[in-house]
Amino acid sequence: MSNSSFHASLADDFERFKRALPRDFPAHVRDVYRINLSARYLDEPLPHPIGKGSGQLSLNLGQLETDAAAGLAFAVLKTVIAQDSAGTQSMAAWAIHETKMKVERLGEGWTVTWKGRGWDRSFEDYLALVRASWDLTASGALLAVPSVKYHLPRLGEPFRDEEYAFTTRALANAWGRSPLLLEKDFSPTLAGDRLADEKAQILRWLREVPQRIRAHANVRLAMKLMNARFDDDFQAEMMNAASGADALVVFNRLFDVERGVAYGGSELSTRNLRVLDRPSGRQAVRPPLSGTGNIHSGRLIVEYALRGCSSVQLHTFFQLPLEEYPATEGSRTQRALHALIFDPRDGLIAVMLERERANTLHRRNGELHFLDLCAPRAN
């Protein structure tokens, strides 16, 4: 089938799938378009690159089951706050109840604003969610990974290793296999906190946290890096300092100091892509990347992939008013996937075919491969 014929099929599929996606849509994409959407997160194989970032949309089993039914590749659970065996949390200020999330337009895109922080229920409740997440992961229905905010000391202060030990061991026991897959969150509210006022302090965290976690269990660790309140050079320096992680999620939302809220939109993706586009941001030797920030189209997925991201994490795009999705039925997750994959102009299939026509993406054994977009570029 020619490239132009693929586009005709794509327009048909876009209309056809407005009510429901094929149960295994990556297989459909491979069969019809000869495009292999396989991706990776934390060295785990994924059927396609689209996952859900940590937050209010991944704090109960019902949400995860809905995501699995829709065909989402992976989800990161709401971030739990580390504690010691007595239940003491040095970062307890982050374990507060979320205010209502507000979805609003920001320029040409969308952002979600809220003032809440981490998991505000009991640690036992979180362990129960991790056990359920493991069941989904083990069945192949959905890779679902826990997220933690651990103690972060000031310069000259020691790490509270008892919190690292108790929390990591408990999560490893609940997870069900070794290694434990885990994401360490450096949140936008942390970026806005006085704790993150000093560059040397932030770099110490990034260098030392991986070994502190791995001292207590066999962990494959992703670190979700914040957008610090410094320049692009420092963002790249943060990536280098975090080289002890197994993967990096780049980068968390921006923080509005005056309003005291985190936000996204085009300002976020512009900064993230600019940092990743620097020679220091796209080194060949570094932990694998997962992109995040204002991803609302397959075209933006490709932009992150071209800068080395082998998967992406979305949050806002799963919360739009229903009328903003082209699909007419299904969960928000399913409607979002429909737009991200099948949109005839800006969907992932369309943009990969566009790059094939431009001779910047080539078939191997008759197929285009998403992961070929992520190959390191020459500096």
Model-predicted regions and their roles:
Residues 49-51, 74-76, 141-153, 179-183, ...:
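Structural preference for beta-strand elements that scaffold enzyme active sites
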Residues 54-57, 149-151, 225-230, 286-299:
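Glycine-rich beta-to-alpha transition loops that act as phosphate-gripper elements at the mouths
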Residues 100-104, 119-141, 198-221, 261-289, ...:
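Alpha-helix-loop-beta-strand connector modules within alpha/beta enzyme cores
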Residues 61-66, 159, 230-242, 281-285, ...:
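Catalytic cores of alpha/beta
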Residues 24-33, 183-201, 225-285, 321-331:
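Glycine/Thr-rich beta-alpha phosphate-binding loop at enzyme active sites
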Residues 1-30, 101-102, 120-121, 267, ...:
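Alpha/beta catalytic cores of nucleotide-metabolism and tRNA/nucleoside-modifying enzymes
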Residues 159-220, 226-227:
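Metal-dependent enolase-superfamily TIM-barrel catalytic cores that perform enediolate-based chemistry
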Residues 1-169:
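N-terminal capping/small domains of soluble enzymes
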